């Protein structure tokens, strides 16, 4: 018997069922359909940030002004991006950067690269305050090839793309242990189950 589980995917569905049962005063003895697996069988990928309608950012000036370590890279050389690094792609080039070490004063969400990039660079450089509701930002799943993202930029379909590192299971676990919430579109979970259409009647 397991005392508790971490929900890797489908939080909104679990929350919706929980809210319904609480408001209706009913108890579902059968629970809800779920798949339980070991964390070693779970693959966590990132979601990348696509920025449009802001104009091409001068990332080098921003990095220099804010003492952010970065380097220019060529996609043809298949650059390696470490787990504590991110990449920003513009029509002028591709840059790998690091925001440096986190501090013990930060909570688990504040330590995430996605949080630091959204609250720092995307807000400070692009002027996007709310990444959940701003039409200028969209998201692309983490297994998208870098060349495809660069092609989107070269076609003029967006201003830049922030290529984010995937969060580790330990990071996701730490967020849950602190009773916090992962930022929207910060994890792409695999495997995706091919279950077809499944319905469960609660009423």
Where are these predicted regions, by residue range?
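Surface-exposed, charge/polar-rich loops and edge strands
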Residues: 1-203
